[in-house]
């Protein structure tokens, strides 16, 4: 079990679960990207589930939560809101207190600060039908995923595309930034790609076609968005 998996299972300490639920969660945690892991931890803080069934409901609806990268407190959140969401006039910015803007925004919706970022509910979750929720897919809905490793993290971290948050730089998506943070590196030149999982099974041996992680990730970002447009 990887370090990420152990940290996620620690959140479920004391939860009763069947073997099939445990096995599914183990696979799901192993397949989580860095961003999914962050969303899950934030959602656990927001929802505070008390039963394994509720955790499975939550984990199958992570797309109902949104991450604001780097907005780790009210001040950071206030700057994020003013720079990327509300865009107040320059004449008004001098009179706005970022901490108060951030606090006001935070109090409007279910939310939590998590490891230097802000997680909020973006849409209401839909109760899934009672039954065996472990029959749901054990990995996120990505067009392509790449597993990166570094000297500091040889276990590797999955990063998935497309990443479609409305408030991020599409050329530097939160998925990638969070993966670099988890790998304790600043650039892709410090990483190696160790695995690829593509939504199109006819595309094979992708890893062997690239000499660098940077080139592979650049094409994965483009591929992920292309796949997302075909699903519109």
Q: Which residue ranges define each predicted feature?
A:
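Extracytoplasmic/secretory-pathway segments with low complexity and glycosylation-like composition
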Residues: 53-61, 65, 69-81
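Conserved small/polar residues in nucleotide/adenosyl-binding loops
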Residues: 230-231
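Internal, hydrophobic cores of structured domains that mediate oligomerization or house catalytic pockets
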Residues: 45, 52, 108, 128-177
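N-terminal interaction modules that seed assembly of large macromolecular complexes
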Residues: 1-29, 156-158, 162-213
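Extended, well-folded catalytic/binding cores that form a central cleft or groove in large enzyme
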Residues: 28-31, 46-47
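Acidic, proline/glycine-rich low-complexity IDRs
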Residues: 75-151
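Ordered, amphipathic secondary-structure segments that act as subunit-interaction surfaces
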Residues: 32-39
């Amino acid at each position: 079990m990887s370090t990420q998996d152990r940290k996620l299972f620690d959140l479920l300490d004391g939860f009763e679960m069947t073997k099939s639920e445990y096995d599914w969660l183990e696979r799901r945690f192993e397949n989580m990207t860095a961003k999914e892991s962050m969303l899950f931890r934030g959602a656990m803080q927001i929802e505070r589930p008390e039963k394994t069934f509720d955790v499975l409901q939550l984990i199958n609806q992570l797309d109902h939560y949104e991450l604001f990268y780097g907005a780790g407190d009210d001040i950071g959140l206030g700057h994020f809101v003013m720079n990327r969401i509300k865009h107040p006039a320059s004449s008004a910015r001098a009179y706005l207190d970022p901490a108060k803007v951030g606090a006001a925004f935070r109090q409007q919706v279910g939310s939590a600060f998590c490891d230097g970022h802000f997680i909020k509910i973006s849409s209401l979750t839909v109760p899934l039908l009672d039954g065996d929720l472990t029959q749901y897919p054990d990995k996120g809905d990505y067009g392509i995923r790449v597993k990166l490793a570094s000297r500091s993290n040889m276990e590797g971290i999955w990063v998935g595309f497309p990443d479609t948050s409305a408030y991020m730089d599409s050329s530097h998506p939160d998925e990638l930034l969070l993966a670099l943070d988890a790998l304790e590196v600043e650039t892709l030149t410090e990483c190696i790609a160790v695995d690829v999982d593509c939504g199109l099974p006819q595309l094979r041996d992708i890893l062997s076609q690239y000499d660098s992680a940077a080139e592979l990730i650049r094409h994965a970002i483009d591929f992920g968005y292309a796949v997302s447009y075909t699903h519109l």
